[in-house]
Swiss-Prot record:
SUPFAM superfamilies: Thioredoxin-like (SSF52833). It comes from Lactococcus lactis subsp. cremoris (strain MG1363). Its EC number is 1.11.1.9. PROSITE patterns: GLUTATHIONE_PEROXID_1, GLUTATHIONE_PEROXID_2, GLUTATHIONE_PEROXID_3. It catalyses: 2 glutathione + H2O2 = glutathione disulfide + 2 H2O. This is Glutathione peroxidase. Pfam families: GSHPx. GO terms for molecular function: glutathione peroxidase activity. Belongs to the glutathione peroxidase family. Keywords: Oxidoreductase, Peroxidase. The keyword Oxidoreductase applies. The keyword Heme does not apply.
Length: 157
């Protein structure tokens, strides 16, 4: 299995295969609208705007598993991200990232990202960096600001 074997549902209800992102550098991030890390949407959007023409994609996955910080409906979440942070990168429908009902993509990401943080998602805005071949290169903690990932991203572009 690799990253390209999975699919997810975008905010508009369209099912998208991760294979659509072959040849791209991808950041996968679990998001929340009412979290102390929510302002990271700005940094993620800045990275996307700066590097999208060089092959960067950012995939946002709202999740309500951490202190009920994304309790809204998908349409509310999408509007919030666009209106408050100008998000233009792809946002998917709300998922679970931990437990028996965790989305298969997140089950894969947690298994592939080695190190002390592997096995579970601890909080919102955990970020996974995936290379152009679909390999999980690095996992970044929620406190890691998007701009701190820039050098790693540039190496992969």
């Amino acid at each position: 299995m690799n990253f390209y074997d999975f699919s997810a549902v975008k905010m508009n209800g369209e099912t998208v295969s991760m294979s659509d992102y072959k040849g791209k550098v991808v950041i996968v991030v679990n998001t929340a609208s009412k979290c102390g890390f929510t302002p990271q949407f700005e940094g993620l959007e800045k990275l996307y705007e700066t590097y999208k023409d060089q092959g960067l994609e950012i995939l946002g996955f709202p999740c309500n598993q951490f202190a009920n910080q994304d309790a809204g409906e998908n349409t509310e979440i999408n509007e919030f991200c666009q209106l408050n942070y100008g998000v233009t990168f792809t946002m998917f429908q709300k998922i679970k990232v931990n437990g028996k009902e965790a989305h298969p993509l997140y089950q894969f990401l947690k298994k592939e990202a080695k190190g002390a943080l592997s096995g579970t998602i601890k909080w919102n805005f955990t970020k996974f960096l995936i290379d152009r071949d679909g390999q999980v290169i690095e996992r970044f903690a929620p406190k890691t600001e998007p701009e701190e990932m820039e050098e790693e991203i540039k190496k992969l572009l």
